[in-house]
Amino acid sequence: MKENETLKQIVLKTLEESVNSLISSFPEVEKEAFKIKIEYSRDEKFGDYSTSFALENSKLLKRNPIQVSKELVEILQKRTDLFEKVDFTPPGFVNFRISTSFLLNYIETSVLSGNYFPKVDLPLKINLEFVSANPTGPLNIVSARAAANGDTMASLLKAIGHNVDKEFYINDYGNQVFLLGVSTLVRIRELKGEEGTQQETTDDTPIEIILEKNILPAEGYRGEYIKDIASSLLKDPKKNVTIENLLKQKKYKELAELCAVWTIENNLIWQRKDLDAFGVEFDCYFSERTLHEADKVLSVMKDLEKSGKIFQEDGKKVFRSTEYGDDKDRVVVRDDGRPTYLLADIAYHKDKIERGYDKIYDIWGPDHHGYISRLSGAVQSLGYKKENFKVIISQQVNLLESGQKVKMSKRAGSFQTMSDLIGFLGKHGKDVGRYFFVMRSLDAPLDFDLDLAKDESDKNPVFYLQYAHARICSIFKEVGDQTSKEAAAILEMSEERKRLLFWIARFPEEIFDSANAMEPHRVTNYLQSFAKAFTSFYLAKDNRLKDASKEVRLGLARICLAAKNVLAEGLKLIGVSAPERMEKEN
């Protein structure tokens, strides 16, 4: 057994060897054409793993699946060191039950030795960009979901040996940023006693009139946080002097641009505070503005033109994105020479490529599916392989309270922020928030049940796991922390004990598979099933350590220690604490 193998890999390798042995007597069969795979048994009564090899390859084998399965069982049964039982279930399934001794040995070399996870043969340098929220306001709930999942993905990828840089892209350039500055300026002038139209009725009012009459743009920002920022700017002596001078000179556009910079700086400070409170730390904050200042946005056009993917149309420069699955070709430079947002995005990803990343992963918000093909095409036109760039869509979050959806709206100022959510959930906000956001696949909408999230009983899936960990800690406090692998090896194995051993041994492969698939929700699914197996073990009378003989107690304690390690390490990977003692909030 290699140290760098999961239990599933060991079983699969054994199956492959057995299949090769079986078909060596079938000279007419091509070995390379076979599909050989295993999966977890759908019903634990049949075994730990199963394979439908004979059914899936019946046409290639040109033999009865039942007969092939029986012959395969005969070969596999010789591996008594690995399998306790191998049997056949019609119409062609082979079931495996791992031997207790093998499970114990495997657990000793993995979960109990600190070598939790196998490492990839070729570690990659990976750029993982997520959250990247507009710096126009506080982080919202969708950003919180991306933060929890992106951070967990990074932890999983690092756990199996990859080098990962977590990156936040700051969209601090463009018209929306200018409108943010105008919105702040409107509030500043209001605080100084100026009167003006509170809201533009149409979206075609010239900017000069908007600024002159102190009109809040239709696409501006109306949240209370804008008023707070305006107030804080006026309280800053240096900024207040600048504001006074520019107002007197009626240099409203210049002041609006300055207000945009100040507002973004303020918002970024609060966004980072929210992320810190959520346990998310980025390796790099990358400003879009720096790309424009370094002339990297327009200069990337040369690369695109060299690729032959640009054509002229009505004075515009257009990227042939339809060649990559887009529904129409996309303008990258307007007829007045200004770049579109797409060109800035292309320049940003060129910068990532130049930084030497083997893989580039982006997590985007809902409703961005259509953008994938055009950016992926641009990345390919720059010479980067399609398979090395991947976009993951983080779908919408629905907050539910008493079974009803809670509305969210950023510009109207009535949205729920990441900070609101953490505060609402109390002292457990970080743990509960991160766990709930990771519970479902990112590509599916998430219903976030606020009532369940506030529940501090074991009905709450987070507390269910934390209570399990705390129970084990209390066991060790009661009977001491001494354990014995020799005592564990001679324990009589009840169904609860054997089931728990298998779930412990599954931990490395569950993490390895979750990391490779970039699906953090697999970890929470596994941990819930694991905790159920531990609870069944814990409640069984013959597993009460304080009532057991010394030898049995030491053996059971060894199993409990492994279970504790799984819970602690599993929760750590998703950014959730594993307390030794549970205390309810008053």
Swiss-Prot record:
CDD domains with a match to the protein in the record: ArgRS_core
GO CC terms in record: cytoplasm
One Pfam family cited in the UniProt record for this chain: DALR_1
Top-rank lineage group of the source organism: Bacteria
Protein biosynthesis recorded as keyword: yes
MF terms (GO), sorted A to Z: arginine-tRNA ligase activity; ATP binding
Extent of motif 'HIGH' region: 133-143
GO biological process: arginyl-tRNA aminoacylation
Record's subcellular location: Cytoplasm
Signal peptide (UniProt feature, chain positions): none
Keyword terms, alphabetized: Aminoacyl-tRNA synthetase, ATP-binding, Cytoplasm, Ligase, Nucleotide-binding, Protein biosynthesis
E.C. code: 6.1.1.19
Reactions performed catalytically: tRNA(Arg) + L-arginine + ATP = L-arginyl-tRNA(Arg) + AMP + diphosphate
The family this protein is said to belong to: Belongs to the class-I aminoacyl-tRNA synthetase family.
NCBIfam families from the UniProt entry: argS
Subunit-structure text: Monomer.
Name of this protein: Arginine--tRNA ligase
